[in-house]
């Protein structure tokens, strides 16, 4: 039986509370209903994510399977026994483990050589990271099978990060491109079991010239610490940076109108949703694959 377990929830919401209050004509100084509004925002974001079958803000999930997949019959002998990761956009794999025939837990590592590196472990996986609403696909290295397994429930576990992007608390020193983020480990491109965070967009408030934001990207990763492509002009300490891409504006608007609908109709409602919500979330953002 396949199951999905949320390991790390989003650290923020795509829509600011102030924007939601503005839509409802509630003064920012009126905080009497903030807890209700935040609950409606969360419910609206989850409704949009569940409908589109994607992840908006960075989150970590654990997928548990009862076995590696077999090749779909419709592909005959040219089939690809792929693991398709739900909730795109994909970011990186934390680990990929399975129970071998002796009952021991083993880790699979990524083979970026597509099976041409004979020195690589025989059992591993290839990664096609997908993009946008297309899910990542993991398959055995070329001309190799998945590893033999002991047939017990939940004998395969894959933990991964997904979402367009999310907030990250960081510190930078003036003149340095090193990004310090306690408690967060960046994934290097040469690590065996992940796609790599090199090239990920980073926006650090206050670290640019004249107090502006430093908009750059991860140039390299060493021991889990990222070095950016551009050094900080000013020092910043424990500021909330943004790692990755921004959530598409259409989906943010869909969340706003969905939250407004929940707020105005109440917790129990059988009314049809406004057409504008369907139009916004159907605008090329629905994952129909995994």
List PLM regions with ranges.
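Divalent metal-cofactor coordination and adjacent catalytic microenvironments
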Residues: 1-175, 179-198, 205-290
């Amino acid at each position: 039986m396949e199951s999905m377990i949320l390991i790390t929830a989003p650290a923020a919401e795509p829509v600011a509370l102030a924007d939601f209050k503005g839509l409802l004509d509630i003064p920012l100084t009126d905080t009497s209903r903030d807890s209700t509004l935040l609950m409606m925002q969360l419910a609206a974001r989850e409704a949009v994510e569940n409908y589109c079958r994607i992840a908006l803000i960075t989150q970590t999930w654990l997928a548990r399977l009862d076995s590696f997949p077999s090749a779909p019959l419709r592909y005959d002998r040219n089939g690809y026994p792929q693991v398709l990761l739900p909730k795109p956009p994909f970011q990186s794999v934390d680990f990929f483990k399975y129970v071998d025939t002796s009952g021991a837990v083993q880790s699979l590592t990524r083979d970026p050589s597509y099976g041409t590196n004979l020195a690589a472990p025989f059992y591993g996986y290839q990664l096609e990271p997908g993009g946008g609403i297309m899910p990542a696909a993991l398959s055995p290295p070329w001309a190799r099978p998945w590893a033999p397994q002991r047939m017990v429930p939940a004998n395969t576990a894959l933990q991964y990060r997904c979402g367009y992007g999310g907030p990250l608390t960081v510190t930078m020193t003036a003149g340095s491109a090193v990004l310090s983020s306690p408690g967060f480990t960046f994934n290097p491109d040469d690590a065996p079991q992940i796609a790599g965070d090199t090239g990920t967009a980073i926006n650090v408030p206050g670290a640019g010239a004249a107090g502006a934001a430093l908009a750059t990207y991860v140039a390299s990763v060493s021991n889990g610490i990222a070095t950016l492509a551009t050094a900080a002009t000013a020092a910043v300490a424990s500021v909330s940076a943004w790692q990755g891409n921004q959530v598409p504006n259409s989906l943010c608007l869909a969340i706003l109108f969905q939250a407004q609908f929940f707020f105005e109709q109440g917790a129990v409602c059988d009314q049809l949703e406004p057409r504008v919500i369907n139009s916004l979330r159907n605008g090329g953002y629905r994952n129909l694959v995994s």
